[in-house]
Amino acid sequence: MTKRILVLEDGTVFEGKAFGADIDVTGEIVFNTGMTGYQESITDQSYNGQILTFTYPLVGNYGINRDDYESIIPTCKGVVVFEEARRASNWRNQMTLDEFLKAKKIPGISGIDTRALTKIIRKHGTMRATLTHVGDSMDHVTDQLQATVLPTDNIKQVSTKTSYPAPGVGLSVVLVDFGLKHSILRELSKRNCNVTVVPYSTTAEEILHLNPDGVMLSNGPGNPEDVPQALDMIRGVQGKIPIFGICMGHQLFAMANGAKTYKMKFGHRGFNHAVREIATGRVDFTSQNHGYAVSREDLPEHLIITHEEINDKSVEGVRHRYQPAFSVQYHPDAAPGPHDASYLFDEFIEMMEVFKQSN
């Protein structure tokens, strides 16, 4: 078994076993606390440019199947596990995790203390990291790593380049792709929506020309401040048609209305995050994947906080006080994770129907 090392920008080194693609990579190291759902996580474009650590000790035991892709071409930089299952056992299995990562040109490392690694990230925050082969001078690797500037065009990398339809017989929805998870599209299709997926750079005029009943702002990777043109688009459609934002879409919707965002120390990544609906006290367990959040202190008067994370009290949902528009930081589409919050898609459908009847 070939050895591979993980080097953090603070100089910490972990030595383990190589699997997946035989290449060196650099990215932001993060951790995911989910016990299952590794295929959905690896193929989630919100992990673009990141080295993904799984805290659950065994990963790969049910293999990779054709149904659980969140995107066809995953763009995470690398995968870190305590133990990689060399054999997969599941009736849907088509290939092992190792075979999948090789095919997608993603390196992995196993056999390291992922609990110790996670504690470092929790204490010091996410940071740059390198997956490389044994043999190079550690001082040289660390110097190179500390000099590395990570890309800021994450959304541009993963957004669709051209518009495409997902036909349905129901309400017409324009889905703006900032790094779209297929599960969002599936939830809209289950509700018979006639969906047009458009690039992140689509203007308000182009969206309104499609005459939709509503606009959905998808999830996506990176810093919401990197796509200022999206704020103009949101302001241009807001009030004219209903809006529903998820994850990155939530942050952009809030920013377009005057809110500010900040980078979290280590983010929320997993599907055991308890979120409280403030008006009712209802608690949902949610799937989350984000490193930025909306600032509670800078929220303008016309945005109402509707949901908050129980543990750190971060803003998990907002609604416009006067217009048909709302957003949530978490993933009501789950994939992976609980479906507690899938009712939000129904609320969006109802919002579009009411708006359509009144206009």
From Swiss-Prot:
What's any GO biological process attached to this entry? glutamine metabolic process
Listed SMART domains = CPSase_sm_chain
Kindly give the Gene3D superfamilies that the UniProt entry links to this protein. 3.40.50.880, Carbamoyl-phosphate synthase small subunit, N-terminal domain
Q: Which reaction does it catalyse?
A: hydrogencarbonate + L-glutamine + 2 ATP + H2O = carbamoyl phosphate + L-glutamate + 2 ADP + phosphate + 2 H(+)
* Region annotation CPSase: where it falls in the sequence: 1-169
In alphabetical order, the GO MF annotations are:
ATP binding; carbamoyl-phosphate synthase (glutamine-hydrolyzing) activity; glutaminase activity
Organism from which the protein derives? Streptococcus pneumoniae (strain ATCC BAA-255 / R6)
User: Under what name is this protein listed?
Assistant: Carbamoyl phosphate synthase small chain
Q: Which SUPFAM superfamilies match?
A: Carbamoyl phosphate synthetase, small subunit N-terminal domain, Class I glutamine amidotransferase-like
Which keywords annotate this record? Amino-acid biosynthesis, Arginine biosynthesis, ATP-binding, Glutamine amidotransferase, Ligase, Nucleotide-binding, Pyrimidine biosynthesis
**The keyword ATP-binding is annotated on this UniProt entry:** yes
Where L-glutamine is bound, by residue? S46, G220, G222, M248, Q251, N289, G291, Y292
Instruction: Tell me the Pfam families matching this sequence.
Output: CPSase_sm_chain, GATase
- Species classification: Bacteria, Bacillati, Bacillota, Bacilli, Lactobacillales
